[in-house]
Curated annotation (Swiss-Prot):
The keyword Repeat applies. PROSITE patterns: TFIID. One of its GO terms (biological process) is DNA-templated transcription initiation. It comes from the Archaea. It comes from Methanosarcina mazei (strain ATCC BAA-159 / DSM 3647 / Goe1 / Go1 / JCM 11833 / OCM 88) (Methanosarcina frisia). HAMAP family: TATA_bind_prot_arch. Keywords: DNA-binding, Repeat, Transcription, Transcription regulation. General factor that plays a role in the activation of archaeal genes transcribed by RNA polymerase. Binds specifically to the TATA box promoter element which lies close to the position of transcription initiation. The keyword Transcription applies. Pfam families: TBP (PF00352). One of its GO terms (molecular function) is DNA binding. Belongs to the TBP family. This is TATA-box-binding protein 1.
Amino acid sequence: MSESSIKIENVVASTKLAEEFDLTVIESEFEGAEYNKQKFPGLVYRVSDPKAAFLVFTSGKVVCTGTKNVADVHTVVGNLAKKLNSIGIKTIENPQITVQNIVASADLHTILNLNAIAIGLGLENIEYEPEQFPGLVYRIDEPKVVVLIFSSGKLVVAGGKSPEDCERSVEVVRQQLDSMGLL
């Protein structure tokens, strides 16, 4: 990966921490928790170390977003479970945490000709309408991700389930552009 530097920007993961939650109890006990079921069916709770946000639902399901790596997801979910336990809410031990989406950025460190890339990659896999969006949208089947390619050489990878998916997708793009003589 020497030609590109990959940085994870956001990890979204989900888990089930209990059979059900009383969100009004959590809102009253957790400082900064926000719950307004007329606006949104879940409780929003933010933490700062490591930085993350939770969507907590009455079903016992929790969505965690905002961390920069998968290890931090496990840390903050564990901390949330401990905090719930501390206010008398029993949680599932060792909950299964599923990464739903990883967004990463990368830089190929070169200016790219998006018109040539659009033709070279084939119109069936890309969307490129520069009047509407300055990037080229490239859908890759393996790993199944979407890569936004910008003329600056910057890439945004969305849809990865692991950091390795993001790294592989950047390598796929780099190799394809290189093989077309566009790097």
